[in-house]
From Swiss-Prot:
Official protein name in the record: Ethylene-responsive transcription factor 3
GO cellular component terms given for this protein: nucleus
GO biological process: defense response; ethylene-activated signaling pathway
Taxonomy, superkingdom: Eukaryota
DNA-binding stretch(es), residue numbering of this chain: 27-84
Biased composition (Low complexity): 1-12, 118-134
Entries under PROSITE patterns matching the protein: AP2_ERF
This protein's UniProt keywords: DNA-binding, Ethylene signaling pathway, Nucleus, Plant defense, Repressor, Transcription, Transcription regulation
Pfam families reported for this sequence: AP2
Length: 225
């Protein structure tokens, strides 16, 4: 009786996904293994044409997720990644994904982008088709009223001397102070000149003396003048 050789079943190829001792190693996009056992992740910037360092991780999966997050941030949802993005995460990414909130992305390479608010000018008809990207303009500061115009002073009626009321018209609403002052000055000058006038050398009520003829001639001459 001939003995047939039993066909040996092929042994399954086993190996760890991280490549820490198996015959076959799973390789991820953008991930390299370091000699000391850690995994480094990096990605190529399509705009700057340079490699961006993402960091060193303990496992290949963490490094691959960091690469996937950076690839979606640079190239959008159609970027080639290591792991497929679930529908829920894909919907959130389309709504608005911020790479700074991702724990696997270095925020130093992705600065925060401020939203740009467009504003249309309303003054000119030709500039109505051009959008202004300078952002909302601050409201103009309210104009401060001058203190001189804001303050109101009560005007007191002018003081008019008593002599002016007799000479000026009482029915007129405007009093000319200059004319009144001139008349008052003239009256004062007349009073001063009359009060300080030198007295005569003789009294006209008394008869002239008869003893001196020369004195009579003098008095007669004075009376004629």
């Amino acid at each position: 009786m001939r003995r047939g050789r039993a066909a040996a079943a092929p042994a399954p190829v086993t190996g760890e996904p991280n490549g820490s001792g198996g015959s076959k190693e799973i390789r991820f996009r953008g991930v390299r293994k370091r000699p000391w056992g850690r995994f480094a992740a990096e990605i190529r910037d399509p705009w700057k044409k340079t490699r961006v360092w993402l960091g060193t991780f303990d496992s290949a999966e963490d490094a691959a997720r960091a690469y996937d997050a950076a690839a979606r941030a640079l190239r959008g949802p159609k970027a080639k990644t290591n792991f497929p993005l679930p529908y829920a995460h894909h919907h959130q990414f389309n709504q608005g994904h911020n790479p700074n909130n991702d724990p696997f992305v270095d925020s130093r390479f992705y600065p925060q982008d401020n939203p740009i608010i467009s504003q249309r000018p309303t003054s000119s008809s030709m500039s109505s088709t051009v959008e202004s990207f300078s952002g909302p303009r601050p409201p103009p500061a309210p104009r401060q009223q001058t203190t001189a115009s804001s303050r109101k002073y009560t005007r007191s009626p002018p003081v008019v001397p008593d002599d002016c009321h007799s000479d000026c018209d009482s029915s007129s609403s405007v009093v000319d102070h200059g004319d009144c002052e001139k008349e008052n000055d003239n009256d004062n000058d007349n009073i001063a000149s009359s009060s300080f006038r030198k007295p005569l050398l003789f009294d006209l009520n008394l008869p002239p003396p008869m003893d001196d003829a020369g004195a009579d001639d003098l008095h007669c001459t004075a009376l004629c003048l």
